[in-house]
Amino acid sequence: MKKYTTYTILILFCLICNIGKLKSQVVSQYGRTDTENQAILYFDSAKIAMERTDFDQAKRYLEKSLVLDSTFADAYSRLATCLIKTRGDVDEVTTDIIKALMLEQSSESLAQAISVIYQLSPMQTDMLLSKLNVMQREYPNERRWFAFAANAALGQSRFYEAAGYYQRAVNIDANPYYQAFIADLLYDAGNDTLALEAANKIGDDLTYQRSYLKAKILMSMGNYQEALLATDSCINIDANRPSSYFERGMIKDKLADIKGAILDFSTVIDLDTTYSYAYYERGEMYSKVGNMNAAIKDYNKALQLNPIPMKEGNSAPFVYLALGQRDKAIAFTDSILTKYSNSDSYYNAACLYGRLGNKQKSLLYLSKALEKGFRRLKYIQTDPDLTIISNLSAFKVVIKKYKNISDQEYKRYLQIINSKAKD
């Protein structure tokens, strides 16, 4: 089963790229011209129209706003969103994004611009990357254009490509957060060896992130003792982070230290009583030692905390399955896929149906997960939830297909990191 331990790259990216101030929020009303005030009124009207999903009207307001103030970065971002929603011209969409990225803006405004990138189709993304490549050549010493390209690639789950662009940014300026992103992206690309090398390069000012990433990667590699030491390091650095104890609990389970795992999951709950996966995993540990009353209590608590599908993942389907409520497990999974049809959701669905013994649906959802970008191929082949399909010829065909795709993605990564700014 997929665990949700990845970095929130967009949020961190925007915090470390704070390159200006948002005009509509930080400029005093008395410091604006009448024209700028009118531009902001149109912008605010556009926001209201967008909330009503009237994107055509919002587009008209934003165009009027930009006529009055052509330096209004947030207006370009929202105009691009409106064009996406109304199936506007691809060239116009990507041009507006570039204009928004070129202008000085706050972290909040930058987040708006980057969020638009994540709404693009593959074709729109390719055009945006082409335009970002032009900006990279024009401003070869500005790391931000490579970082923007990384986010564009990440929006299409092109993990190798995103890692390559972040590496280009690091070559300009050794930003430790970008180095952490590289390690995390290479992990998601399924290349644990390169991911570990990247994690080891993270500077001492991010010692916690370095240790946490190493723990996750080493666990994926099956180096459980080393992974355990890495989680111990995380806890020594900051004893109040629930995720460190959760990761250590998962590792102790692999090492058959069930009592130790229970203690760690209990610590997670002490630190964060809303951590639903900790209740589920502790319930699993109680079940392994035959304490079914405690297990059921934890399962029910996990369900109480996971009443609706969430983008960051749900323990609920697996809890229902542990309680023997197969129909509810399936129904909840279906609701997740309806609302959040991303690669992680499909991978979890494949695991659920693997546990249910439904080979056809397990393979179908695994194929969907891979199609949407899931690339941890070695993990897939050793995941106990997928044992039921791992010997099927169709499974081997799918893995071979995406191994070839992954190899091509790796070649693209090498091409990016070895290219010159003038190329």
Question: Could you describe each region identified by the protein language model?
Answer:
Residues L68, L103, E138, N171-I172, ...:
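Structural marker of alpha-solenoid helical repeat scaffolds
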Residues L22-E63, V67-R78, I84-D91, T95, ...:
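N-terminal leader/linker segments that initiate helical-solenoid repeat arrays
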Residues S65, K99-A100, V134-M135, R168-A169, ...:
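Canonical positions in the second alpha-helix
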Residues K47, T81, S115-V116, N151, ...:
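Residue-level recognition of tetratricopeptide repeat
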Residues R32, A39-I40, A73-D74, S107-S109, ...:
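Helix-start (N-cap) detector for alpha-helical repeat units in TPR-like alpha-solenoids
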